[in-house]
C-alpha cells in the first residue's frame, strides 16, 4: 500500500532486505497486537475467540498479565527491533552503494509505516468502538457491523 500510494517501487534487494522486513513486520504486527488489547473486553462479551489475549489466558495468565505480556512483546521485541533496523539502514545503504533517490524512497516507506503504526494507535485510543459504553449485547450490531448496515 505504501509503495502504491507513494507512487514508487523499492528494488527487490532493498524490499527484501532484513531491515526492511523487520520494519514491515512491525507495521503489521504492532497494530494487530494493540488491537488485541483494546478489543479484548468487547470481544469477550461477544464470545469472539480470535484474540491473542484469550490465547495467553488459556495458558493460565490473568487478563491483566496477558495485557502486560503483549505490551512487553511490543516494546521489547517489535519496537526495539524496529528502532535497530532503522538505525542499520544508513550502513546498509553505504555497503550496497544505494543511490540517493532510492534512499529517499526507503525513508518515505519507513516513515509511512511508522505513521501508520502511530495513527492506528491514536485511532484505537480515541474511537468509541473500544469504550465500555459501546460494548453492547452480542445479538446487536457493534461498531464494525454498523459500518456495513
Specify the residue positions occupied by each region the protein language model found.
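Alpha-helical, largely C-terminal catalytic domains
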Residues: 1-149
